[in-house]
Amino acid sequence: MDISQKIQKLYEQTGISPEVHDFGEKIEKSLKERFDKIDKMAELNQLKVIHAMQEARVNAECFNYASGYGYNDFGRDTLEKVYANVFHTEDALVRPQITCGTHALALTLSANLRPGDELLSIAGKPYDTLEEVIGIRPSTGSLAEYGVIYNQVDLLPDGSFDFDSIKKAIGEKTKLITIQRSKGYQTRPSFSVDQIGEAIAFVKKIKPEVICMVDNCYGEFVEEKEPSDVGADLVVGSLIKNPGGGLAPIGGYVAGRKDLIEQCAYRLTSPGLGKEVGASLGVMQSFYQGLFLAPTVVAGALKGAIFAANVYEKLGYAVVPDGKEERHDIIQAVTLGSAEGVIAFCQGIQAAAPVDSYVTPEPWAMPGYDSDVIMAAGAFVQGSSIELSADGPIKEPYAVYFQGGLTWAHAKLGILMSLQKLYEKGIV
């Protein structure tokens, strides 16, 4: 028995039928050229991260445990230099005290907006959890409660920026403009770094002093550039997504202009204290090592997303991005057209997990969302979406959002298992 036969036998032991396995093999063979390009991008970004670490003179002392106030936490301070080097920014704030991506965004917005200022989204409605942060849906402590005005410019029908409407929307009170790089729970295309750069340049011509913030979640290390390379004043993300490499157990980051990062630090801790406090509590090695591995991990996730797109496109489902499009984040949307399809897909992803594979996910009323949501994530870190995961709101158009996979082999297994569940239920 050769290795290919042994692999197929192991797939059968995990519940993958020969029909599903053979279908997947044909799709994978057609993607060799795409996968080679992804490996080259990973090599480029790996070298970029190593260079950033060398420039910051990372050493073993950076991994030491720090507690209490965290004064002179060498590892924490050096890591923030590394992030500033990676993103080519003046400064960065990278902390375990930033609990998630939504927290990082809420922190950045509340730190840099004052009563009477206007926050303008030029990419339409933001991600669901930000609706309560902003006050689109009433919530205690929202920006609206503190007198921040919110306005948005919807995207054009093709998913591109509506430059005419953006020009009209920018006014005297417009203080901060936000761009969400990834699609979130939408079926629009995600933005490329170049598209974001074009929008920022357009905005800065109209009002040079306006702050341009990019929600960078799911986009780090997908391209050779980051939004901070094309004019973003602030880029914001989560360490349990791409830059944590699957190892960071918690955390978020903000990178950008020094004066704006200072505002974020004062909001995170206290006026007068800022970046000086906030002990790292023993997580530094996982933060450094996760960042080091991130380009390779992101490459595996990208291969999984492209594989998923091609598998489901071949079966006649609408997928965003499609099987041939260039990638700008790690998320793959598949419109399955029914609640049963979304649930079966997510149950397949869960069944492929190394952790909690025996659990059957069901839709539930998740805080921050306006409909029931189903989430599949048999992850080592709870909620980690750089690990193999899938989720989606149980509402029209019944799209599921697949992302992650610390390795390509695991991402492949997840997609095959999702297809197996749909096959068993007679949906495909």
Language-model features: where?
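Conserved PLP-enzyme active-site core in the AAT-like
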Residues: 3-13, 17-24, 28, 32, ...
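Active-site-flanking structural segment that lines cofactor/substrate pockets
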Residues: 57, 63-93
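Short helix-loop-beta junction
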Residues: 85-89, 141-148, 354
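Structural motif
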Residues: 91-94, 117-120, 175-176, 209-212, ...
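Conserved C-terminal alpha-helix-loop-beta "cap" of PLP-dependent enzymes
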Residues: 313-427
